[in-house]
Amino acid sequence: MVDYYEVLGLQRYASPEDIKKAYHKVALKWHPDKNPENKEEAERKFKEVAEAYEVLSNDEKRDIYDKYGTEGLNGGGSHFDDECEYGFTFHKPDDVFKEIFHERDPFSFHFFEDSLEDLLNRPGSSYGNRNRDAGYFFSTASEYPIFEKFSSYDTGYTSQGSLGHEGLTSFSSLAFDNSGMDNYISVTTSDKIVNGRNINTKKIIESDQEREAEDNGELTFFLVNSVANEEGFAKECSWRTQSFNNYSPNSHSSKHVSQYTFVDNDEGGISWVTSNRDPPIFSAGVKEGGKRKKKKRKEVQKKSTKRNC
């Protein structure tokens, strides 16, 4: 008989927040898309994880489960109230996953941006009571359990952002793997409105390499270690073209198409997840001001006009 507490690695006195964090961690571990070579077992485990979350996150279901086990949930036996005699119906594991992550890639930049806005607006939060035009916010890995495995430090993950009249304008994070400071990932993203157009800039610094790109509807520039990179620019344009050509909003298929790509960094031992709807790189942050940066941007823009993305 399955033990839902054991499935999520929880004690029986676990709080609702503990249950949600545990689901985040275990669901990502057993997601079928992350286990293509062991998909049958992964699907079974993924289903158990979803069921465990549905039961333990619901006070009524959890109370019945604690008293009578899965038999009580299935409507069997004679030890539970008549009002529950018909049992419960579980949702599809994928539906539970989407509901928890709000149909967003759990490792995407937008996921963290939205989560931080939720933090600011949370009832009783000291952040939510501050002036939104000038407020700064900080958080640690305890707020986002998906980063816990990256760090052996109590404050291994830290984010900082600022809120202006346009809303959330920047977000940055830093994560270390357990092998030490030599292998790390730093990601930064920013959005700003310029002449009515949204400019999205993203940057990733992984160990000793920095990649940066700017997008205002079309790829504007692509830099590697602050130097224009034609190969990277071409690959990014190619990826976007292929993604656009392969996308059809009216097409349907009975086959399962993965929404998420689980990427392993062999050198750093770090697992990362990207959305198949987003570019396969983590591009970007903007360095404020500087004649050198402006000069490079102009040079890359001239080159980009010669290409058709």
Curated annotation (Swiss-Prot):
Residues 3-69 form the J domain. One of its GO terms (cellular component) is nucleus. It comes from the Eukaryota. Residues 282-309 are annotated as: Disordered. Keywords: Chaperone. Pfam families: DnaJ. The keyword Chaperone applies. One of its GO terms (biological process) is chaperone-mediated protein folding. GO terms for molecular function: Hsp70 protein binding; protein folding chaperone; protein-folding chaperone binding; unfolded protein binding. InterPro entries: DnaJ_domain, DnaJ_domain_CS, DNJB2/6-like, J_dom_sf. Probably acts as a co-chaperone. This is DnaJ homolog subfamily B member 7. The lineage of its organism: Eukaryota, Metazoa, Chordata, Craniata, Vertebrata.
